[in-house]
């Protein structure tokens, strides 16, 4: 009887492990057509998803920070620290409501910019800020604000794996004249947030739908 009970417990544990492993594969697999990223995942899933945004030599020692449940907060905001890091980089899982994975890993200057924007403050960029999005992202277009319902967005622009560079305020004129077309796959300039005049230089390293790793 004892052996049978142990066997059942081991079997149950194995099934649970397989279920978790199967779920974790969805952290980086392409989203099924017609679905959107959500906040409702396990911490392990979010960590795996977030760390996929940057090269291993950066992500393996990065801090991972979750978003606050948008259904509760009513807006995008930083939440719990899921894992503490040591190298000054911070990785975040998917932003909910996007038609493809879009985790990001940012260095300290870029995180200062992001925190200012989320907090409703005008960023004062004093250093070059850098971030990785190696799973790519989907954007609503130049100057478009976040949609309340992603199903109502008429056209998404899919950007392949890329890095983003934010320049100090006194140097942003260096981005003048650079491509602003999101469709041609070339590096382009955009605003990090349509309400804040902080231009960034987005540099794709793969085509949309392609992966680095």
What is each of the regions a protein language model found here?
Residues 17-23:
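Signal peptide processing junction and immediate N-terminal pro/mature segment
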Residues 1-2:
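N-terminal secretory signal peptides that target proteins for export/translocation
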Residues 5-17:
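Bacterial N-terminal signal peptides
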Residues 23-213:
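Primary mode marks residue(s) on the alpha4-beta5-alpha5 output face of response regulator receiver
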């Amino acid at each position: 009887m004892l052996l049978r009970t142990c066997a059942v417990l081991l079997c149950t544990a194995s099934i649970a492990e397989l279920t978790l492993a199967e779920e974790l594969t969805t952290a980086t697999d392409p989203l099924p057509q017609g679905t959107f990223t959500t906040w409702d995942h396990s911490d392990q899933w979010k960590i795996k998803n977030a760390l996929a945004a940057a090269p291993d030599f950066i992500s393996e020692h990065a801090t991972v920070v979750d978003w606050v449940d948008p259904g509760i907060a009513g807006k995008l905001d930083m939440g719990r620290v899921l894992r503490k890091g040591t190298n000054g980089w911070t990785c975040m899982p998917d932003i909910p409501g996007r038609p493809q994975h879009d985790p990001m890993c940012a260095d300290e200057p870029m995180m200062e910019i992001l925190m200012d924007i989320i907090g409703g403050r005008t960023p004062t960029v004093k250093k070059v800020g850098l971030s990785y999005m190696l799973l790519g992202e989907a954007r609503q277009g130049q100057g478009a604000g976040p949609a309340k319902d992603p199903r109502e967005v008429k056209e998404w622009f899919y950007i392949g794996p890329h890095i983003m560079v934010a320049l100090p305020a006194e140097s942003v004129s260096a981005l003048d004249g650079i491509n602003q077309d999101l469709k041609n796959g070339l590096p382009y300039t955009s605003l990090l947030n349509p309400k804040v005049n902080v231009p960034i230089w987005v540099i794709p390293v793969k085509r949309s739908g392609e992966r680095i790793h």
